[in-house]
Amino acid sequence: MDVILEEYAGQVVPIRYHVWWPNGSDCFWLFNQPEVTDRVDYYGVPAVPQIHIDGPEYNLVTYDGLRAKFDERLAVSSPIRIANFVQMPYLDSVYVSFDVIADEEPSGTDLRLRLAVTEWRH
Protein backbone atom coordinates (compact mmCIF):
# COMPACT_ATOMS: atom_id res chain seq x y z
CA MET A 1 0.00 0.00 0.00
CA ASP A 2 2.77 2.46 0.87
CA VAL A 3 4.36 2.00 -2.57
CA ILE A 4 1.27 3.13 -4.46
CA LEU A 5 0.61 5.93 -1.98
CA GLU A 6 4.13 7.23 -2.62
CA GLU A 7 3.38 7.17 -6.35
CA TYR A 8 0.21 9.21 -5.83
CA ALA A 9 1.62 11.54 -3.16
CA GLY A 10 -0.18 14.87 -3.20
CA GLN A 11 -3.16 13.38 -5.04
CA VAL A 12 -4.37 10.57 -2.77
CA VAL A 13 -4.40 10.94 1.00
CA PRO A 14 -4.88 7.87 3.19
CA ILE A 15 -6.77 8.01 6.46
CA ARG A 16 -6.01 4.92 8.51
CA TYR A 17 -8.11 4.04 11.54
CA HIS A 18 -6.95 1.43 14.05
CA VAL A 19 -9.90 -0.61 15.32
CA TRP A 20 -10.28 -2.60 18.55
CA TRP A 21 -9.98 -5.98 16.89
CA PRO A 22 -8.03 -8.18 16.79
CA ASN A 23 -6.20 -6.36 19.59
CA GLY A 24 -8.16 -4.11 21.94
CA SER A 25 -4.96 -2.71 23.42
CA ASP A 26 -3.75 -1.02 20.20
CA CYS A 27 -2.40 2.37 21.34
CA PHE A 28 -3.93 4.24 18.37
CA TRP A 29 -7.35 2.74 19.12
CA LEU A 30 -7.08 3.56 22.82
CA PHE A 31 -6.19 7.17 22.04
CA ASN A 32 -9.04 7.79 19.60
CA GLN A 33 -11.95 5.46 20.45
CA PRO A 34 -14.95 7.77 19.78
CA GLU A 35 -13.82 8.80 16.28
CA VAL A 36 -12.83 5.26 15.26
CA THR A 37 -16.11 3.83 16.54
CA ASP A 38 -18.00 6.53 14.63
CA ARG A 39 -16.19 5.68 11.36
CA VAL A 40 -16.66 1.92 11.86
CA ASP A 41 -20.40 2.47 12.41
CA TYR A 42 -20.68 4.95 9.51
CA TYR A 43 -19.00 2.64 6.97
CA GLY A 44 -20.32 -0.61 8.47
CA VAL A 45 -16.86 -2.14 8.74
CA PRO A 46 -17.17 -5.89 9.42
CA ALA A 47 -13.47 -6.75 9.08
CA VAL A 48 -10.09 -5.18 8.50
CA PRO A 49 -8.23 -4.24 6.44
CA GLN A 50 -10.87 -2.45 4.40
CA ILE A 51 -10.48 0.28 1.79
CA HIS A 52 -13.00 3.00 0.94
CA ILE A 53 -12.34 5.32 -1.99
CA ASP A 54 -14.48 8.47 -2.08
CA GLY A 55 -16.91 6.79 0.32
CA PRO A 56 -17.83 3.36 -1.08
CA GLU A 57 -15.93 0.23 -0.11
CA TYR A 58 -13.41 -0.97 -2.66
CA ASN A 59 -12.68 -4.72 -2.64
CA LEU A 60 -10.16 -5.25 -5.44
CA VAL A 61 -6.98 -4.58 -3.48
CA THR A 62 -4.19 -5.20 -5.95
CA TYR A 63 -1.63 -2.68 -7.12
CA ASP A 64 -3.10 -2.58 -10.64
CA GLY A 65 -6.66 -2.44 -9.28
CA LEU A 66 -5.86 0.44 -6.95
CA ARG A 67 -3.98 2.28 -9.66
CA ALA A 68 -6.94 1.98 -12.04
CA LYS A 69 -9.38 3.12 -9.33
CA PHE A 70 -7.19 6.06 -8.30
CA ASP A 71 -6.86 7.17 -11.93
CA GLU A 72 -10.62 6.80 -12.45
CA ARG A 73 -11.47 8.93 -9.41
CA LEU A 74 -8.76 11.53 -10.13
CA ALA A 75 -10.26 12.05 -13.61
CA VAL A 76 -13.52 13.27 -12.00
CA SER A 77 -13.41 16.96 -11.15
CA SER A 78 -14.59 18.02 -7.73
CA PRO A 79 -17.35 20.62 -7.37
CA ILE A 80 -15.51 22.10 -4.37
CA ARG A 81 -12.02 23.23 -3.50
CA ILE A 82 -10.47 23.23 -0.06
CA ALA A 83 -7.86 25.86 0.68
CA ASN A 84 -5.90 25.28 3.85
CA PHE A 85 -3.76 27.67 5.81
CA VAL A 86 -1.12 26.44 8.23
CA GLN A 87 0.83 28.39 10.83
CA MET A 88 3.52 26.92 13.05
CA PRO A 89 4.49 29.73 15.41
CA TYR A 90 6.18 27.37 17.86
CA LEU A 91 7.70 23.91 17.70
CA ASP A 92 4.83 22.47 19.76
CA SER A 93 1.88 24.20 18.01
CA VAL A 94 0.21 24.01 14.63
CA TYR A 95 -2.77 26.17 13.67
CA VAL A 96 -4.82 25.08 10.68
CA SER A 97 -7.83 26.73 9.04
CA PHE A 98 -9.81 25.77 5.96
CA ASP A 99 -11.86 27.59 3.35
CA VAL A 100 -14.32 25.50 1.35
CA ILE A 101 -15.13 27.02 -2.05
CA ALA A 102 -18.02 25.70 -4.17
CA ASP A 103 -17.10 26.03 -7.86
CA GLU A 104 -20.49 24.63 -8.90
CA GLU A 105 -23.98 24.59 -7.45
CA PRO A 106 -24.05 21.47 -5.25
CA SER A 107 -26.45 18.73 -6.29
CA GLY A 108 -28.39 16.81 -3.67
CA THR A 109 -29.91 17.88 -0.39
CA ASP A 110 -28.24 15.74 2.29
CA LEU A 111 -24.69 16.92 1.71
CA ARG A 112 -21.89 16.51 4.24
CA LEU A 113 -18.27 17.49 4.14
CA ARG A 114 -15.84 15.71 6.40
CA LEU A 115 -12.41 17.27 6.86
CA ALA A 116 -9.55 15.40 8.44
CA VAL A 117 -6.17 16.69 9.47
CA THR A 118 -3.67 13.89 9.04
CA GLU A 119 -0.01 13.42 9.67
CA TRP A 120 1.62 11.92 6.60
CA ARG A 121 5.09 12.11 5.19
CA HIS A 122 4.15 13.78 1.88
Residue ranges: model-predicted function:
Residues 1-3:
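Conserved redox-active cysteine motifs that mediate thiol-disulfide chemistry
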Residues 9-122:
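Short, conserved sequence motifs used for protein processing/export or organelle targeting and
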